Amino acid sequence: MDYAKESLRLHKEWKGKIEVVATVPVENKDDLSLAYTPGVAQPCLEIQKDVEKSYELTRRHNLCLVVTDGSAVLGLGDIGPEAGMPVMEGKCALFKEFGDVDAFPLCIRSKDVDEIVNTVALLAGSFGGINLEDISAPRCFEIERKLKERCDIPVFHDDQHGTAVVTAAALLNALKFTGRKIEDIKVVMSGAGAAGSAIIKLLIELGLKNVIMCDRKGAIYEGREGLNEEKAKMAAITNREKQAGSLADVLKGADVFIGVSAPGTVTEEMVKTMAKDPILFPMANPVPEIMPDLAMKAGAAVVGTGRSDFPNQINNVLAFPGIFRGALDVRAKDINDPMNAAAAHAIANLIDESELRADYIIPDPFDPRVKEAVSAAVAKVARETGAARI
């Protein structure tokens, strides 16, 4: 199938992938008086007395905002907020279908950090959570940080944390399959943007000790000249031996390669220099850092990508619907690192160790167990860490 051509045809037919639907009947005068004036005044007064009642008396308890500025849409780059709308609508559809979360797209005509933060923060009282999407680095880090400071509802940048959760889940199972422990392995990350940073932080939360991050100039380490603020922060928690050199240099002896960078950055020869039975997650889209067949030919034990036409697709839809479902169910004030770690374990544990195979380390996104497992794990840890309101 020509997905581009067929998708364009269907988008013209659909004229949007989401809609607002009334949940109550408005078929007579009594219905009208209850859903709207004069009866609606009473819930308004209740919320005036206690804003928390907005979760009980409105749809806020199940409503999320999906926010973009259109600056980093898929692999298309800075295409603008209006052009990002089809992706945001699609995201909202996935929220509903995979998490039963009502989501609304907000495409903002600004790239100014403070304008975006102020716009979203002013709207936060109408929503139970905020999902940031397709905002370019390093601004995405600052936007998320400032919104977390200003908002008392979860703020979640899916390009960072959703990717990190599913990558971590896949790695946990790949380590089981190859007989390794996370505290003993060496990981090399290609890509120092939003996703790469979040993946490393979550893996460290899960026990990883030895990890080297690379950008276009090679290994990142403390003291390397020209690092921006975010890369300097990553240098402080990675590459403790301050190993310098190219990606090829630091990949020697590594157990795991994770790529969120560019096509063709890893060769068969580089894979052959890694530890025995290496794990490779080349996730650049649509063309990965190395094609799976080449990685396997060079000795890889497990390969996962971001593509649905290869085994072991590392797909964010396994994470964000269940994470938000769990957070909303307990009226969470935040989605913290332990909650993300719990989501990763929940996804990984859906596959019994006896069922693991080289081509089956991560559940299918359509597995009906995913939402319940992830949401329950996230809600439990939200309560344990004090992030839950109820």
Describe the predicted segments one by one.
Residues 1-155, 375, 381, 385-389:
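N-terminal ligand-binding/catalytic initiation module
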Residues 12, 55-60, 65, 96-97, ...:
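Solvent-exposed alpha-helices and their adjacent loops that cap or buttress functional pockets
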Residues 74, 79-99, 157, 161, ...:
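Glycine-rich phosphate/diphosphate-binding loop of Rossmann-like nucleotide-binding domains
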Residues 105, 131-134, 155-158, 189, ...:
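General beta-strand structural signal in soluble alpha/beta enzymes
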Residues 150-164, 280-285:
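Short, acidic/small-residue loops that bind anionic groups at enzyme active sites
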Residues 158-159, 180, 282-390:
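Adenosine-phosphate binding glycine-rich loop
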Residues 232-301, 307-309:
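Rossmann-like adenosine-cofactor binding region
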